[in-house]
UniProtKB/Swiss-Prot annotation:
It comes from the Eukaryota. InterPro entries: C-type_lectin-like, C-type_lectin-like/link_sf, C-type_lectin/snaclec_domain, C-type_lectin_CS, CTDL_fold. Regulatory subunit of the blood coagulation factor X-activating enzyme. Activates coagulation factor X (F10) by cleaving the Arg-Ile bond at position 234, activates coagulation factor IX (F9) by cleaving the Arg-Val bond at position 226 and is also able to activate protein C (PROC). May serve as an exosite by which the enzyme recognizes and binds to the Gla domain of factor X (F10) in a calcium-dependent manner. GO terms for cellular component: extracellular region. Keywords: Blood coagulation cascade activating toxin, Calcium, Disulfide bond, Glycoprotein, Hemostasis impairing toxin, Metal-binding, Secreted, Signal, Toxin. The lineage of its organism: Eukaryota, Metazoa, Chordata, Craniata, Vertebrata. It is found in: Secreted. One of its GO terms (molecular function) is toxin activity. This is Snaclec coagulation factor X-activating enzyme light chain 1. It comes from Macrovipera lebetinus (Levantine viper).
Length: 146
């Protein structure tokens, strides 16, 4: 009896070590999981607005990818560089000037429409780590996350 319990306990330990913490995150088969979120890079080229809409149609709670750490950015860059034809993809920061409140050094409000006619959104470059701005109407790949 003692040997049975010992073997059973040993098998339980092996099972738990192979299965991780028990908090694994299940993603659809064509999505990749990282830190309890699911990601997918699409080769479709879309402007920022259409890319965000596209992501929301892919899965419940899905949006353009948001990046909350350097490690997450590394993961996304690696995923994108393996999947995408071109090295740029939209991230979930769009129309940067829309909600910004800024003022000149003399206290006057900045009128962004005088600065640029087009809105600027952010994308990630898979060849160079970091975010870049580009007009939201340009085309780039799509990376979704939920």
């Amino acid at each position: 009896m003692g040997r049975f319990i010992s073997v059973s306990f040993g098998l339980l330990v092996v099972f738990l070590s192979l299965s991780g913490t028990g908090a694994d995150f299940d993603c659809p088969s064509d999505w990749v999981s990282y830190d309890q979120h699911c990601y997918k890079a699409f080769n479709d080229l879309k402007n920022w607005t259409d890319a965000e809409k596209f992501c929301t149609e892919q899965n419940k709670g899905s949006h353009l990818v948001s990046l909350h750490s350097s490690e997450e950015e590394d993961f996304v860059v690696n995923l994108a560089s393996q999947s995408l034809q071109y090295p740029v993809a939209w991230i979930g920061l769009g129309n940067m000037w829309k909600e910004c409140r800024s003022e000149w050094s003399d206290g006057g409000n900045v009128k962004y429409k005088a600065l640029a006619e087009e809105s600027y959104c952010l994308l990630i470059n898979t060849h160079k780590k970091g975010w870049r701005s580009m007009t939201c109407n340009n085309m780039a790949h799509v990376i979704c996350k939920f």
